Amino acid sequence: AGAKAAVLAEQAGGQAVAAYKAEERMEVGGLTRLPALLAVCEGIDQGLLQPSASVTVSEAAARIKGPTAFLSAYEVIDAASLLKAAVMILAGDAIYALAEAAYGSATACTQRAQARLSELGVEADYTELMGMDTRLSANDLMALGRALMQSPAFTAYSSLFYDGINHVDGRATELASSNRLLKTSVGCKGVATGSSASAGYCGVFSVTRGGAAWICVVIGAPNASSRSEAASDLIDYGFAAYEVKALARLVQVLIE
C-alpha cells in the first residue's frame, strides 16, 4: 500500500516471514520515542517507580512538543496516568516525566534506552530522550515492539483505543490512539503509531488470535488508512500461513 518499508514476524521468536527494505534505517516519526518508552516501562516493571507514586512534572517535561498529555510544569500527577498517556499516544511530556521519576534524570533514562537498543541488536545512536534524530529500520521497530509486548507495564494500557486522564486542577485530557487496528482487527493488543510530514505514516502492530501472535511494522505509508490497510493485510497473511502450517502438522500426525 505504498509503504517505504515493512516486516511481518512471529512475535514469539521474531522470525520474519515477509519483509520489504526491513533493514534500511529511515525516519519513523514519533516512533523514535519507543526506546525511551521501553526503558520507562521496564523500569516500572522492575520497581524503580510504583504506578501509584505521585510525580512532579518538570519544566523540561512540560516543554516537550508533539503528541502530549498537556502536562503543566510543577503539576503533580500519579505515575499510572502518565503511563497510560505514554503508552496510548506516545505522549512526550508523560514519557519524559516518567523517565525522570524512574531513573533520576532524562540523561540516565536515555543511557538505559541506548543500552537496551544494544541488547536488542539495534545499532542506532540514541543520544536524546525523544530520539529526535534517530533513524530506525522496520527490523529495529519489530525488536522494540516485541520487547514492549513482554512488559506488563506496557500491556496494561496498550489495548486501549480511547480513554483519558484527570489533572489535579480539574482539567481532563482525552487520549485517542491512532492505531485503528485496535478497533478493526480482532486480537490487536498494540503497539504504537507515529507520523510526520517527512516520515509518512508508520506503525508497529501486535495481534494475537488463538495460539498465534504476529507483529508487523509499516514505515512511510502515504496516509493513516493505507498504514492500517497494509498492516491488516500483513497480519491476515500471517494468520493464513499459520493455519496452513497447523493443518500440515495435523495431517502429518494423522499419517504417522
Enumerate the predicted regions with their spans.
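Penicillin-recognizing serine hydrolase domain
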Residues: 1-5, 105-255
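Active-site-adjacent loops and short helices of periplasmic peptidoglycan-processing enzymes
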Residues: 1-139, 143, 149-152
